Regions:
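Regulatory, non-catalytic segments
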Residues: 1-114
Length: 114
């Protein structure tokens, strides 16, 4: 498993926004995102990240405690040790107090000529 140094998430909110801080779960620890900009109201784009500097066993974007949050587009940029930075995109989803979106993706495999 690679050591994740930091990540940044960009979310375009669909038709259901939320008022709460955006949180994520990292290895079963619930944390707020840092270095945030934008918003989570309908049509707004939110950006935030976190410098974790740890091996990622699990990582998920967590739904709000009350109501629903519709995510139209989700992009996560990863910076892991000993690998070039990479990004992953996720399909639209709706989160609530019982749902999470798994946003961890292993780094792409190295390619080489044969």
């Amino acid at each position: 498993m690679p050591r994740l140094n930091k990540f940044k998430v960009r979310v375009k909110t669909g038709n259901k926004g939320m008022q709460e801080p955006v949180r994520f779960s990292f290895n079963s620890h619930l944390l707020p995102l840092e270095d945030i900009s934008g918003g989570t109201q309908p049509g707004e784009v939110f950006e935030g990240g976190y410098e974790v500097r740890s091996v990622a066993h699990s990582m998920a974007l967590v739904g709000p405690d009350k109501g629903e949050w519709s995510l139209k587009k989700i992009t996560v940029d990863f910076e892991c040790e000993n690998t070039p930075p990479y990004s992953a995109e996720f399909p639209a989803v709706e989160l609530n107090d019982t749902t999470e979106l798994d946003i961890w993706k292993d780094p792409p495999l190295s390619t080489f000529d044969v």
